[in-house]
Structure formats: C-alpha cells, structure tokens
Amino acid sequence: ALPIYKNINFSSREQKIKHMNPYEIIDKYYPENTQQRQILVIHSLAVSGKAMKMLDAHPELRLNRSFVKEAALLHDIGIFQTDAPTIQCFGTHPYIAHGYLGAEILRAEGFPQHALVCERHTGAGLSLEDIIAQQLPVPHREMLPITLEEQLICFADKFFSKTHLDEEKTVEKARQSIAKYGEEGLSRFDRWCSLFL
C-alpha cells in the first residue's frame, strides 16, 4: 500500500450505509423559493460536483459514490440555525457550530454516517485540542474527518464559499481559507492535495 493510505479508516465503505434522497431532507428544513435555500443548494451542488470529479479521477480509492453525492449535498444542512445574515441565516448559533448542528439533524433523521460528514467538515476538521485551545463554541470532542469519503467532501468544500457562489477557489486560495485553523489543518489540506488532485 502507498504510504499516504496509512492509518486511513475505510469504515464508510465497510459499513452498511442507509441511502436517501437528500432533497427530502433539504425540503424539510429549507422552504422553497427562499434565498437561504438557493444559497445552500447552489453551494452544495458545487461541492458535490467537485467531490464527484475527484472521485472519478481516483477509482483506485474505491469510494462510495452514492454516499459521497448524498453527504456532499447535506454537509451544510445546519446553517439555518446560525447567525450568518450575509448568507440569509438568522438563527442564534455562531456559524462555526453549523457542522455539529447539521449532524444533530441528520442523526435525528436516521443517517448517522451522513451526520459525521456534517460534524467533521469545518475547516480541515477540528481536533479536540484545537477546539479547547481556541475556545470554539462547539462540543468538546474530535471533529476530524476520518473516512476517505469524509476527507474528500471536507476537501471539496474548501474550494467554494457561500458568499461567492459562482466562483471556484484556486488551490492556493482554498489553502489560505483554512490557514486560520492552524498548521495541523494546513498539513491535512496538503495531504488531501496529494491524495485527491
């Protein structure tokens, strides 16, 4: 095996994953014909498209195609609960909480593996150590992407912002956007460049 695969958990391929229509869940939490829904869907489709292109370019990774598509479309399902008016979200939680809030929604809907993608996609993932050191307003637990599918979606998400929906970031701009999360995040991002690009 190549060294880059060392210590990677392939559990999402090994477990029985319950599949679904992501739009049934989106419909439940995001009313039709709202800017909030439009922002969510356009961004999520861009992330899903990028993830699927990388998945197709790397058949040797044997990623779970339907899971990647579904989870990429739902990775930001929790944004409506946050206070982020620039993207039409008028909830009460800080934006950084959208990952674990989305995970709570998907667990309640019966999709625990999809929930982990929500919880683990913020930045390049959040370690418990970083959460505590930076006093981030999220639960104190590891929130690092583990499976290759989780890593792929987290990586694809770094190329798109919800404030510039029609623009894909360059690798350098995507890298800069996660620099605020620390050296560990940059190191993960660089590993993903080698693995997925």
What are these regions (language model features)?
Residues A1-L2:
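Short, small-residue-biased leader/transition segments that mark boundaries at the very start
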Residues H19-I26, K53, A57, V171:
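Active-site hotspot residues in diverse enzymes, especially metal/ion-binding acidic/histidine motifs
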Residues D27, S48, M52-L55, G102-R107, ...:
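Amphipathic alpha-helical segments within well-ordered protein domains
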Residues Q15:
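Cationic, low-complexity basic patches in intrinsically disordered or flexible, solvent-exposed regions
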